[in-house]
Amino acid sequence: MAKDKTNDMTVGNPVSLIIRFMIPMCLGNVFQQFYNIADSIVAGQFLGVDALAAIGSTGSLMFFVTGWLNGLSSGFAILVSQWFGAKQYDKMRHYVAMSIYLAAAFAIVMTIGLEALNEPILRLMNSPEDLMGSVKGYMGIIYAGLLVTAAYNSLAAFLRALGDSRSPLYFLIISAVINVFLDILFIVKIGMGVEGCAYATVIAQAISAVCCLIYIIKKFPILHLKKENFEVSFTSFRYLLALGIPMGLQFSITAIGTIIVQGAVNIYGSVYMAGFSAAGKIQNIIVTVFVAFGATMATYVGQNRGAGKMDRVKEGMRYTQIMILIWSVITMIIMFFFGKYMTWLFIDKSQTDVINVSVTYFHTVFWAYPFLGSIFLYRNGLQGLGYGLVPMLGGVFELVARSAIVMFVAGKTSFAGVCLADPAAWIAALIPLIPYYIYVMKKWSRGKKETAA
């Protein structure tokens, strides 16, 4: 029965497997982005620029919080994918159970801590006083729903670890539609304001999590856990945390950098906040292809590493790099020439000052998309191989680069100077990633030759 729903990526044509897995991942990422985008569209159209700025200014903070949980879940799922690739299903189920313990614990602790620090964090980000009430209320509701976020991330990660990228997509589509309906209901009909967007997001994510759980129960007997699977093993916790924490920190370190940039943008006022927010949301949609390729490689590399098929790892990485470069060129053209028109989704055409801010961002960063795409490839490839520290180090390089640019230009030069923080960060992140990947593959090749000799 398991063969009907799982996807063994250790056999078959690598390119075909990667593309078939990547497409649902990409669509899933689009709908994941749609949660916050739907909030921004409804808020911007019905509540005005200040509401759009309030929600938009939380983007980097939400990425910090949800990125940490997503990184943890993705790290835990790598061990699940490796044991699945090795056909050691009892060990796989054990690590699923231990992952559930850890994800729940982290979500609960984060909820308590972030609720207590809600306002101090927003003040550190230079959130304008006139928006403080709206932003604080919005994030407070998001924090209260972190257990739901952790549940969905974990369940979806388990499905992807076993090669199923389609089912999480279907659940996201359903919940995204519900999210839009609830946004309109809470804001337009009931008049709940910005907080209505947050309630809609949490409820929609809860629906995704429930759908995932029901689907696993009905269609994935290989993931049915028994009492013995839940026997606590601190050794297993250590193995999971060795991958989960670096991946969570990598997301969070990257998010800290974007929070620093957001704080710099906030200095320029609500017009720049709104324009930067719209540009960021559009860019997030466009680069979901990069994110999908990266997540695909984590599963592909993890399964093949577990099966000991390192030749397939190298082959898959090489072909994926080519596909990423092709999409980078397409993305550069789209953002440079058509980015302005895409902002109309969030901003009224008459608000030319806000639109010009978005266009300035696009024209400043578009040339660096090949570097951004490569980050996802090498970061996730190394993580799939079981190396968590170097990808985290790449995040540190990102943070240093962003911080340095902001330190020297924020409030001292034009907005375009702040925008350069992103390309600088993308290039810096690759400094440890590519050399270490080359080192790992050469080390494996030498070991193979020595064994053959």
Language-model features: where?
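Short alpha-helical transmembrane segments in multi-pass integral membrane proteins
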Residues: M1-M22, V80-G145, K189-I245, V301-A368, ...
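Small-residue-rich hydrophobic transmembrane alpha-helices
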Residues: L52-I112, T149-P168, F276-G339, L372-G394
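Helix-terminus/linker motif at the lipid-water interface of multi-pass membrane proteins
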Residues: V30, F34-A53, L122-E129, L185-M192, ...
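Hydrophobic transmembrane alpha-helices of multi-pass small-molecule transporters
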Residues: F64-G67, T111, N179-I184, A209-L213, ...
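Transmembrane helical elements of multi-pass membrane transporters/channels
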Residues: R20-D39, I141, S175, A204-S208, ...
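Hydrophobic/aromatic residues within transmembrane alpha-helices of membrane transport systems
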Residues: L27, D39-A43, I55, V80, ...
